[in-house]
Design a protein with these regions (language model features):
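Active-site-proximal polar cores
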Residues: 1-32
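Short, conserved turn/kink motifs that form compact alpha/beta structural patches or helix kinks used as
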Residues: 20-110
């Protein structure tokens, strides 16, 4: 394990909250859910550009919980239950340390 992963784990453990990521059922594939820890934050005014809107959030998660659940990578259209409300993934960016996938940075709205 690298330093970036350990730093990310500490941040999510200290500031994170429990949330649920949901892949909706499509084309005969059943709905899948995974409970995980994530660290949400609002985008700062200087970060609001392009398709990002005021009120959108960035959520940092680890890859460990997704891997353990066999969930796969989060993608646009997945749902996230955050603080009791449901938001929709607008995008997700994988986070690597070297060649190792260590997490995802999610862009959510709702």
């Amino acid at each position: 394990m690298g330093q970036m992963l350990e730093t990310r784990r500490r941040m999510i453990r200290s500031r994170g909250r429990t949330m649920r990521l949901i892949r909706r059922a499509t084309n005969g594939v059943p709905q899948q859910t995974v409970d995980l820890m994530g660290f949400p934050r609002l985008y700062r005014p200087g970060e609001i550009e392009g398709a990002i809107q005021q009120g959108d959030q960035q959520v940092e998660i680890l890859a460990d919980e997704l891997d353990a659940a066999g969930f796969g990578a989060p993608t646009t259209g997945h749902l996230l239950v955050l603080d009791g409300r449901q938001v929709t993934l607008q995008g997700a960016r994988p986070i690597y340390e070297g060649a190792d996938l260590i997490g995802h940075s999610l862009w959510v709205r709702g």
